[in-house]
Regions:
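Glycine-aromatic micro-motifs
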Residues: 1-147
């Protein structure tokens, strides 16, 4: 299954635990979506990122091939939040070459608006660097850091 990862799931340490059989395919962005911190994490003690529809915006990430077992592990790792807090959804991403591709991603069922913390953003930025995402993506995430 081709799965679009973004935010903290791009961090290589986290990705290795949550989808151990993953294979990197390419970087891409999800058009007409933006990041919203709409779930609270007791582990991170801050808001967690999810994607929401947002015309004209984009969310950068990477597409990986993952197994059914990876998907089960990934879902189990979301145990920091109640069951059903996240859902899988089909989305069309655009590669750096402009190719459109239907993949799966996950999104939170929002419960409110929360703020991220610096340590969470730094964790995300490690993944952005690892997968060589765009400078636009890096700057977007740096802008989420608390002042």
């Amino acid at each position: 299954m081709k799965f679009f990862f973004y935010a903290d799931n791009l961090n290589p340490s986290q990705l290795k635990r949550r989808a151990p059989e993953h294979k990197f395919l390419f970087t891409a962005y999800l058009p007409d979506h933006s990041i919203q911190f709409c779930r609270w994490s007791t582990q991170w003690r801050c808001g967690l990122a999810s994607v929401i529809p947002s015309p004209g915006e984009k969310v950068w990430g990477a597409v990986f091939e993952i197994t059914d077992e990876d998907l089960k592990i990934l879902d189990d790792f979301e145990g920091d939040v109640p069951q059903g807090a996240y859902r899988h959804l089909p989305v069309t991403v655009i590669t750096e070459e402009g190719e459109k591709l239907l993949v799966t991603t996950h999104a939170a069922n929002p419960i409110g608006k929360f703020k991220p913390k610096e340590h969470y953003i730094d964790w995300v930025l490690k993944g952005i660097k690892q997968w060589k995402l765009s400078e636009e993506c890096t700057e977007q995430w740096k802008a989420y850091k608390p002042a």
